[in-house]
Amino acid sequence: MAGEVKGSFANPLIEQRQLAEGSAAVNLGPRGIITVTGPDRLDWLHSLLSQNLKNLQPGQSAEALLLDPNGHIEQVIHFLDDGETSWLIVEAEGREALLKFLTKMVFRMKVELSDRSEDFTVIGRLIRGENAKPELDQAANSNGVSLTWVDPWPGVVTGGVRYSRAWPAKWPWTET
């Protein structure tokens, strides 16, 4: 996996405060990063995952689930697309199983899979407060598109419905 995770750089209390204010980022440690290229990638992934990915625009992100035949969650996938490549970010422990499953499901679709876990590391941060640093979102770009996954939970996503009152914490979380 790309890079080792350093526990703290100096004072964990100050670092935690900076993270909560949006002026710092944190290395999320080892993650599995799988890319899917090819003209059929969005239709193919749409057919395999729980999320409507067919009309995802370049730069948009989503959260998708890989379910077993009984509907139990096998993988939680943070999904990004840059217009030519779909980027799937998963926990490191699930990378190999997901890659194996996806490879078996290719059939005749025009897609190519690649394990990019060694090439990248994932950082996370909150976007809030006057100290927020939007330049952190430019850490990774592909095909001119920022590779920033935005957590959909603080709001209602397209096609979604709110079943309870709004979540009180308006802390937009991103991963780049």
Can you describe what each PLM-predicted range is?
Residues 1-176:
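Basic, glycine/lysine-rich polyanion-binding surfaces/domains
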